[in-house]
């Protein structure tokens, strides 16, 4: 009994000592200094986008900060590792299935052969039946006939654009209709816009002319989700291939008349005005592509690469005077086989370091690979893409873009 009493006394004394120590500790403890908000912002900008998306749930303040335009723009200025985007398509019971995959681009190297492994599946259920046309600043455009969607590859947000209900050409039952969607950015008002060019051949067979309409939609802010028709003082035209955005302006090749030479159309995303440049007459429209060269818009003509091993680069030097410069590129004979082994090529643009991205056409289904052509070193390297589903090897696949931007903008 005495033992139990002594134990109770000891436990009671120990509890008192514990409470006293806690009380003394609380009195001596210094308050934790508050982290300056500017430092919080600096720390957040150094985190990957996936972490930022999770941290939105920390508090309303953090959510507002991460979703704010100033914070988003700050992230855009910080280059992320470039990523390649692949679109794989297969037809099952007349239904088109689309798979969107992503992989890190290979590092700079003089090695002729290397590989890169697919590490992300970005497919969303709403993408079924759509084809990816291009990617710009973390935003991807998906098209199915006259319908379009915008997909943020960082936030995984997929938005369906409204139909252009007021379009006369789209309302017509005409077989030769062509529709091109393109994402652009107005650097003055910091606005993202989607441009849509709708065109078709005219009914005047002897004239071989076209009809075209031009529409613009704001992706955010006042007036968003509504198409506006804009005027063009130049003749109606039909776009040839996808456009390229450079310095706040969209560029694309087009036909004005079937029998005429091609033109380079320039659309200023801020002023929403068009201009046209006559393309040099010996450029064949089917085997060329737009790219950036030294901060200028250029056309790479690869019509003769498989026969003579040469490409021709045309660079816009002066738009007002329609002045172009040209440069002949002779492919290294030891690397020519890499080009000749591909049935058809498409110019997809350039990497961050200026290498031209050459993508095999849909006829080449045996292996996933691309070519990177360094114009300065005259060096071609082949990048084999590994990790793709084998079931798509006998169907349509294509690399649809390269981008080095993580965009947290809410659509």
UniProtKB/Swiss-Prot annotation:
Q: Which CDD domains match?
A: F-box_AtFBW1-like
Q: Which Gene3D superfamilies does the UniProt record give? A: 1.20.1280.50
Superkingdom of origin: Eukaryota
Please report the stretch or stretches of sequence annotated as the F-box domain. 29-75
Q: What is this protein called?
A: F-box protein At4g19940
In terms of InterPro entries, this protein maps to: F-box-assoc_dom_typ3 (IPR013187), F-box-assoc_interact_dom (IPR017451), F-box-like_dom_sf (IPR036047), F-box_dom (IPR001810)
Pfam families in alphabetical order: F-box (PF00646), FBA_3 (PF08268)
């Amino acid at each position: 009994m005495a033992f139990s009493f002594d134990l109770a006394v000891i436990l009671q004394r120990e509890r008192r000592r514990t409470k006293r120590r806690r009380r003394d500790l609380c009195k001596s403890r210094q308050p934790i200094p508050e982290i300056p908000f500017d430092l919080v912002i600096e720390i957040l900008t150094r985190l990957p986008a996936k972490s930022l998306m999770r941290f939105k749930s920390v508090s309303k303040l953090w959510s507002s900060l991460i979703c704010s335009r100033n914070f988003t723009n700050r992230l855009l200025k910080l280059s992320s590792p470039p990523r390649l985007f692949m679109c794989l398509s297969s037809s099952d019971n007349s239904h088109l299935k689309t798979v969107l995959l992503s992989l890190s681009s290979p590092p700079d190297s003089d090695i002729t052969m290397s590989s890169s492994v697919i590490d992300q599946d970005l497919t969303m259920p709403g993408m079924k039946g759509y084809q990816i046309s291009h990617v710009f600043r973390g935003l991807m455009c998906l098209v199915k006939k006259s319908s379009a969607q915008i997909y943020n590859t960082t936030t995984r947000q997929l938005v369906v654009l409204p139909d252009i209900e007021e379009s006369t050409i789209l309302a017509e039952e005409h077989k030769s209709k062509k529709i091109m969607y393109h994402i652009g950015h107005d650097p003055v008002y910091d606005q993202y816009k989607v441009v849509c060019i709708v065109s078709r051949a005219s009914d005047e067979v002897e004239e071989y002319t076209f009809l075209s309409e031009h529409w613009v939609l704001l992706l955010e802010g006042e007036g968003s989700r509504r198409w506006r028709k804009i005027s063009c003082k130049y003749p109606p035209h039909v776009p040839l291939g996808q456009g390229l955005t450079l310095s706040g302006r969209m560029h694309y090749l087009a036909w004005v008349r079937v029998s005429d030479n091609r033109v380079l159309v320039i659309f200023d995303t801020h002023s929403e005005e068009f201009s046209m440049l006559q393309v040099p007459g010996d450029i064949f429209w089917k085997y060329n592509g737009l790219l950036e060269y030294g901060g200028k818009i250029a056309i790479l003509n690869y019509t003769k690469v498989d026969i003579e091993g040469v490409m021709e680069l045309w660079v816009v030097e002066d738009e007002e005077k329609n002045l172009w410069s040209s440069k002949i590129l002779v492919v290294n004979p030891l690397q020519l086989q890499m080009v000749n082994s591909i049935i058809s090529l498409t110019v997809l643009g350039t990497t961050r370091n200026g290498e031209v991205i050459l993508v095999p056409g849909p006829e080449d289904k045996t292996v996933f690979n691309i070519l990177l052509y360094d114009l300065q070193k005259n060096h071609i390297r082949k990048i084999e893409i590994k990790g793709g589903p084998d079931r798509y090897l006998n169907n349509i696949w294509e690399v649809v873009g390269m981008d080095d931007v993580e965009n947290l903008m809410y659509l």
